[in-house]
Swiss-Prot record:
This is ATP synthase subunit delta. InterPro entries: ATPase_OSCP/dsu. F-type ATPases have 2 components, F(1) - the catalytic core - and F(0) - the membrane proton channel. F(1) has five subunits: alpha(3), beta(3), gamma(1), delta(1), epsilon(1). F(0) has three main subunits: a(1), b(2) and c(10-14). The alpha and beta chains form an alternating ring which encloses part of the gamma chain. F(1) is attached to F(0) by a central stalk formed by the gamma and epsilon chains, while a peripheral stalk is formed by the delta and b chains. Pfam families: OSCP. It comes from Thermobifida fusca (strain YX). HAMAP family: ATP_synth_delta_bact. One of its GO terms (molecular function) is proton-transporting ATP synthase activity, rotational mechanism. The keyword Nucleus does not apply. Keywords: ATP synthesis, Cell membrane, CF(1), Hydrogen ion transport, Ion transport, Membrane, Transport.
């Protein structure tokens, strides 16, 4: 998000933080995800609610009339805050509701360590899916119903991960919102990391890193980015040696395979 949407999102999250202590956060997260699904489906409603020329009071009144008997008061407050705000694009409005849903879902994991646990579970599930094409196909095929996919996720993860992780994986699988499964899992992971006040570095290495190597890398990246760094490490033998590090959209490629590819590009040029 940029400009006015970024400012509005900051205010929505600030007001959400005031609501969370007295709310049933699991219910709040679930209901907000349902609102996301509604807004994604109802294009005209989404555009009308995001229209900067519209009256905030009128938007809030419409939301109240649509949702008052269907969701909790806490959910109604959050959605009302979102529709009263100004957004650059209709998509930004829905993304704000989705981010509020994610934060409500992980609200019981208050400490940075607990939030890192959710990140790790999302990352590990993403690696499992990437390594099992048949499982990925079962989770992403258009031919399977949402209920079938939801049941599959529950059978795979129930009792093995936190309730928050199970909820977020289920959302990424059943309502991808135009993202691939991997993109959805990474998006939720980034939102959790932002909540924990740190960045995620996805590190690809040919062999496992020792604890000492991980600590040194973490410290070096923290100095570079000026923020705590959480490492997600992928073992990728085909890179031969060295490391590839991705933080957000920035990639540091120090792999041998990367250097060979660069030499080949130069020779070809």
């Amino acid at each position: 998000m940029q400009g006015v949407s970024r400012t509005s999102l900051t205010e929505v999250i600030r007001r959400l933080d005031d609501i969370l202590p007295s709310a049933n956060t699991a219910t709040l997260g679930h209901e907000l995800f349902e609102v996301v699904a509604l807004l994604d489906q109802e294009h005209s409603l989404r555009r009308w609610l995001a229209d900067p020329a519209g009256s905030p009071d009128s938007k809030s009144e419409l939301v109240n009339s649509l949702l008052e008997t269907k969701v909790s008061p806490a959910t109604l407050l959050v959605v009302s805050d979102v529709v009263r705000a100004q957004w650059s694009r209709p998509r930004d409005l829905v993304d704000a509701v989705e981010q509020a849903a994610v934060l409500a879902t992980v609200a019981e994991h208050a400490s940075a360590r607990e939030l890192e646990g959710v990140e790790d579970e999302l990352f590990r599930f993403g690696r499992i899916v990437a390594g099992q094409p048949e499982l990925r196909a079962a989770l992403t095929t258009d031919g399977a119903s949402i209920e079938h996919k939801r049941t599959l996720v529950e059978n795979l993860l129930s009792g093995k991960v936190s309730t928050a992780t199970l909820t977020l994986v289920t959302e990424a699988v059943t309502r991808p919102r135009g993202r691939t499964l991997e993109q959805g899992l990474e998006h939720f992971s980034q939102l959790v990391a932002e909540r924990a006040k740190h960045y995620i570095a996805v590190v690809r290495a040919a062999v496992p890193l020792s604890e000492a190597q991980q600590s040194r890398l973490q410290a070096a990246l923290t100095r570079i980015y000026g923020r705590d760094i959480h490492l997600n490490i992928e073992i990728t033998p085909e890179i031969v040696g060295g490391l590839s590090i991705r933080v957000g959209d920035e990639v540091i490629d120090g792999t041998i395979a990367g250097r060979i590819a660069e030499v080949r590009r130069r020779l070809a040029g």
